[in-house]
């Protein structure tokens, strides 16, 4: 919608806004540092809404919790939009001057009455109405989301439905109001910024634009493919079809992090050749033909970029152990082994080459990053101090650049349908003390650790006739596993939760579905149909 893949606001604004909406985000556990900024906002008087199927530890801080049914976010967002329009709460001046496509959007959301939305989402109509009125009438508001929005087969449409609300109300492009997609893990933002995307060059520049491509080719001395590459789910399809036969995996554990892990194992084992470059011998590395030991955090120089677009320096403090080496050294050695005359640059030299090609980063020298304690892009030159928020251009009159488009999107239920055979909805996520597939965090003890359990509502536990700690069998259309029961009063009957952190004990991705969003390639980790049975 806006041209670059980053949040529009800064954490400072979260602390000073009037209203915070946490939608599909259990930031209290998954992004605890970010949530400190949210709590500062709450303590400074901000109202807070939480939209989440579970009454999570984040939702517990909210003034209002909307206990949405899994996979019904678009229906809820469209109903909020309809209520704002029907009650005359839209920012008409902003819509007329800075957006396009409003009439088509209004026609789409007109079908999402409060009654229909309640039927689809399970959220009472008066609560939907309250969210609509408070969001529309707040002087400033921040709309935040994470993987509860993006790990669905219609992830992109989910995001578009939320962006529509900011355009309706003018909560974009000005201090205190914006959109905050909190990234899934450390430096995901930085990876995207650097072009670790199949359709973008560094700085979110379109790889299919010949003029942009030509600038990079002139510096790199190589021809860049004119077509965008495959996102991860298309790569899976290419493995299935025998088109993709070799894989180079850097810092990823797809054997345990991808949906439908049984099928993923089949794909990886069917490759002709696989290289894994990582700091640990992951389950994926155990399947590799070659493992290249890489240096970790504290063993390399470079930068990280946070969800507020802030680029910060990281510094090497110790040498990597054993045969482990810096990623740059490994990649340059590989290039030389393949016949290319590559020098091995320092991290700063690699960064300077990138920022010379990316207008978002042009003014971010290492010296300035250190002196300023980090800089938020865009920072086009050394006369710029970066940008607290994005898209202030939408408040210029007249708007001389591209207007922000509305997108009319419709509700589509989860692919994995609930049936008599699979009557329970499983959703997955994170816990406070653990990290992703547990390769790093599983190596130390924690008094807060909740291992590979399945969380049930007490009501479902009573129906199954199980007590806390008893083992149950969880079966989906793809696989099954056993796990101990943990009762969680934040869950409603019919909804169960498992974390992603303990695949060696309870491989939750043996259950999940490899149905993916055609636009983003993200699999539907959040909505699996399962059957839960007591183990005798």
How would you name each of these model-derived features?
Residues 173-175, 420-422, 526:
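Short, basic and Ser/Thr-rich N-terminal targeting/leader segments
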């Amino acid at each position: 919608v806006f041209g670059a893949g980053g949040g529009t606001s800064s954490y400072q604004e979260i602390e000073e806004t009037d209203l915070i909406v946490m939608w599909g985000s259990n930031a209290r556990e998954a992004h605890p540092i970010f949530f400190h900024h949210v709590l500062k906002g709450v303590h400074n008087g901000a109202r807070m809404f939480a939209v989440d199927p579970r009454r999570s530890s984040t939702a517990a801080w909210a003034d209002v919790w909307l206990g949405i049914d899994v996979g019904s976010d678009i229906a809820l967002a469209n109903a909020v939009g309809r209520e704002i329009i029907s009650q005359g709460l839209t920012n008409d001046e902003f819509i007329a001057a800075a957006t396009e496509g409003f009439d088509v959007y209004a026609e789409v959301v007109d079908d999402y009455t409060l009654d229909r939305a309640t039927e689809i989402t399970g959220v009472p109509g008066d609560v939907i109405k309250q969210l609509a009125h408070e969001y529309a009438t707040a002087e400033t508001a921040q709309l935040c989301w994470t993987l509860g929005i993006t790990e669905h087969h219609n992830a992109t449409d989910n995001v578009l439905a939320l962006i529509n609300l900011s355009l309706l109300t003018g909560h974009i492009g000005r201090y205190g109001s914006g959109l905050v997609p909190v990234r899934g893990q450390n430096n995901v933002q930085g990876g995207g910024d650097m072009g670790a995307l199949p359709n973008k060059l560094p700085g979110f520049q379109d790889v299919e634009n010949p003029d942009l491509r030509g600038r990079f080719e002139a510096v790199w001395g190589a021809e860049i493919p004119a077509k965008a590459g495959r996102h991860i789910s298309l790569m899976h399809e290419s493995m299935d079809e025998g088109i993709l036969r070799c894989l180079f995996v850097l810092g990823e554990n797809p054997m345990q992090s991808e949906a439908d892990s049984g099928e993923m194992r089949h794909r990886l084992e069917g490759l002709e050749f696989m290289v894994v470059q990582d700091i640990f011998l992951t389950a994926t590395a155990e399947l590799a033909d070659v493992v290249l030991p890489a240096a970790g955090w504290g063993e390399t120089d470079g930068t990280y970029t946070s969800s507020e677009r802030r680029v910060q320096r990281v510094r090497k403090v110790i040498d990597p152990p054993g045969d482990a080496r810096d990623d740059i050294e490994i990649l340059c050695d590989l290039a030389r082994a393949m016949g290319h005359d590559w020098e091995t640059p320092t991290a700063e030299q690699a960064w300077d080459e990138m920022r010379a090609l990316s207008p978002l980063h042009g003014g971010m020298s290492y010296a300035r990053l250190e002196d300023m304690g980090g800089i938020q892009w865009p920072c086009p030159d050394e006369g710029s101090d970066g940008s607290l928020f994005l898209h202030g251009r939408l408040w210029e009159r007249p708007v001389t650049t591209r207007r922000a488009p509305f997108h009319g999107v419709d509700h589509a239920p989860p692919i994995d349908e609930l049936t008599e055979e699979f009557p329970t909805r499983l959703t997955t996520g994170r816990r406070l003390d653990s990290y992703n597939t547990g390769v790093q965090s599983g190596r130390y003890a924690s008094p807060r650790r909740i291992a590979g359990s399945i969380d049930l509502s007490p009501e479902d536990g009573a129906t199954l006739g199980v007590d806390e700690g008893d083992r149950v069998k969880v079966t989906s259309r793809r696989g099954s596993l056993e796990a101990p029961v943990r009762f969680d009063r934040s869950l409603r009957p019919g909804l169960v939760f498992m974390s992603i952190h303990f695949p060696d004990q309870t491989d939750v991705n043996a259950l999940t579905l490899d149905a993916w969003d055609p636009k983003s390639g993200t699999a539907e980790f959040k909505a699996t149909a399962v059957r839960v049975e007591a183990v005798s």
